[in-house]
């Protein structure tokens, strides 16, 4: 059963003619030569930051089936060097199979809109073919004209973490200024709006309490 408060989600789910859910890994692997992996990689704290145990376990399951001629694409957040130094070796028994990185940039409460209208699509791959395939897939899905940033997996892993870190820092800074305003009696909305009007800063993710 799929239930969520995400806008547009239930409408798309109930009107889709092609969506098919299954708990059978074989069915998923046999359905297409392009396999997207979207699982949790929660922040684990410490020096590793992101917990790769779930995605690694899934790659090991796929490897045990010795699939051939597949393009496997990981869409969850990874630490730098995971694709090249961990993930690809977990698929060592999969003949003619590539492993690439295509993380999403969406926020809860705006997932569908963010997916359909991305500012950019980040693709980390060593395969020119995969880069072209993914761009063609997105061109059929998105409703805008995003920038396609195609690079090696390591560069893409660092790009994803950099963007996440920058947005988190911007939100934290806005909340810090909000606290200062509350302490001295200033209007935090007026202050942050004025600061955000500077094109070098911008108002996105720069509002009191924004998370």
Region locations from a protein language model:
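Structural/interface elements that position substrates and couple domains in central-metabolism enzymes
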Residues: 1-211
């Amino acid at each position: 059963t799929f239930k969520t408060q995400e806008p547009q989600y239930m409408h798309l789910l109930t009107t889709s003619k092609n969506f098919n859910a299954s708990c059978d890994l074989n069915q998923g692997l046999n359905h297409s030569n392009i396999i997207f992996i979207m699982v949790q990689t929660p922040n684990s704290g410490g020096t590793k930051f992101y917990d790769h145990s779930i995605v690694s376990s899934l790659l090991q399951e796929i490897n045990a089936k010795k699939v051939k001629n597949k393009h496997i694409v990981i869409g969850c957040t990874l630490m730098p060097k995971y694709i090249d130094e961990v993930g690809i070796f977990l698929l060592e028994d999969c003949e003619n199979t590539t492993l690439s990185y295509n993380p999403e940039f969406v926020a809860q409460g705006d997932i569908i809109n963010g997916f359909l209208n991305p500012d950019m699509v980040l693709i980390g791959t060593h395969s020119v073919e995969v880069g072209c395939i993914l761009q063609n897939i997105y061109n059929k899905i998105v409703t805008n004209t995003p920038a396609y940033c195609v690079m090696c997996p390591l560069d893409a892993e660092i790009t994803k973490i950099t963007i996440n870190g920058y947005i988190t820092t911007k939100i934290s800074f806005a909340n810090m200024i909000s606290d200062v305003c509350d302490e001295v009696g200033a209007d935090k909305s007026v202050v942050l709006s004025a600061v955000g009007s500077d094109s070098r800063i911008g108002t996105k993710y720069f509002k009191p309490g924004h998370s």
